[in-house]
Amino acid sequence: MSIIGSFPPGGPRVEVQETRVQTDRVLTIPNILSMARLAGVPLFLWLILRPEFGGPQSDGWALLVLALSGVSDYLDGKLARRWNQISSLGRLLDPAADRLYILSTLVGLTWREILPLWLTLVLLAREAMLLVMVGILRRHGYPPPQVNFLGKAATFNLMYAFPLLLLSDGSGWIASLAAVFGWAFAGWGTTLYWWAGVLYVVQVRRLVRADVAAD
């Protein structure tokens, strides 16, 4: 749910995205789905890089792992909310899996020269910026920012873009069509990814300024 954090008169009002923890259990169905999604990261990276090391083409299997990851990403959040199984572990696993899939896909597609290096660096720079913000929040006693709608929308766009771009690494009309839609999703995803990152920076700045003013 979305809550508004109020500060002393004259202070900023910061919108914070928060999901209330409803259980301390670890072995819930949503958490198991998130763990399975995390376990798929090295498998996906191995499948996508096999051709680069003399192995057979495994793009079909890599696409399947990515598709299953997307399905589990949708299900773990939906089931956690429906069954009141939102947990502290789940709140860590879900964004961790998202970021690891994005990172592994960036590595694989850049290594195979499907993605240009500049785009990979742009996306990694956003991640580095967010890590700095998390460090600042921790120093002031705040938890890491929760994933908001904009950040989730950016992730979904990128997770649509990457399999389409992988599919475009071929010939024929299907590859050409995949390239068009893949780059469209990549453009939107990168824009939203940075937009969400800038909003995090603005929120962190306001929180820190409010902290300093309170002292």
UniProtKB/Swiss-Prot annotation:
Record bears the keyword Transferase: yes
Protein name: Cardiolipin synthase (CMP-forming)
Topological type in the membrane: Multi-pass membrane protein
Cofactors demanded by this protein: a divalent metal cation
Keyword annotations: Cell membrane, Lipid biosynthesis, Lipid metabolism, Membrane, Phospholipid biosynthesis, Phospholipid metabolism, Transferase, Transmembrane, Transmembrane helix
Comment on bound cofactor: Highest activity found with Co(2+) whereas Mn(2+) supports a lower activity; no activity detected with Ni(2+), Ca(2+) or Mg(2+).
Principal subcellular localization: membrane
Membrane spanning residue stretches: 29-49, 60-80, 117-137, 158-178, 179-199
Biological function: Catalyzes the synthesis of cardiolipin (CL) (diphosphatidylglycerol) by specifically transferring a phosphatidyl group from CDP-diacylglycerol to phosphatidylglycerol (PG).
PANTHER family to which the protein is assigned, alphabetical: CDP-DIACYLGLYCEROL--GLYCEROL-3-PHOSPHATE 3-PHOSPHATIDYLTRANSFERASE 1, CHLOROPLASTIC (PTHR14269:SF62), CDP-DIACYLGLYCEROL--GLYCEROL-3-PHOSPHATE 3-PHOSPHATIDYLTRANSFERASE-RELATED (PTHR14269)
Enzyme class at the top of the EC tree: transferase
Family: Belongs to the CDP-alcohol phosphatidyltransferase class-I family.
Record InterPro entries: CDP-alcohol_PTase-I (IPR050324), CDP-OH_P_trans (IPR000462), CDP-OH_PTrfase_TM_dom (IPR043130), CDP_ALCOHOL_P_TRANSF_CS (IPR048254), Phosphatidylglycerol_P_synth (IPR004570)
Effects seen without this gene: Inviable. Knockdown of the enzyme leads to lower cellular cardiolipin levels, higher phosphatidylglycerol levels, and increases the distance that hypha grow before changing direction and branch.
Domain of life: Bacteria
GO MF entries: cardiolipin synthase (CMP-forming); CDP-diacylglycerol-glycerol-3-phosphate 3-phosphatidyltransferase activity
One GO BP annotation of this record: glycerophospholipid biosynthetic process
The reaction(s) this protein catalyses: a CDP-1,2-diacyl-sn-glycerol + a 1,2-diacyl-sn-glycero-3-phospho-(1'-sn-glycerol) = a cardiolipin + CMP + H(+)
GO cellular component, one term: plasma membrane
Cross-referenced Gene3D superfamilies: 1.20.120.1760
Compartments reported by the entry: Cell membrane
EC number: 2.7.8.41
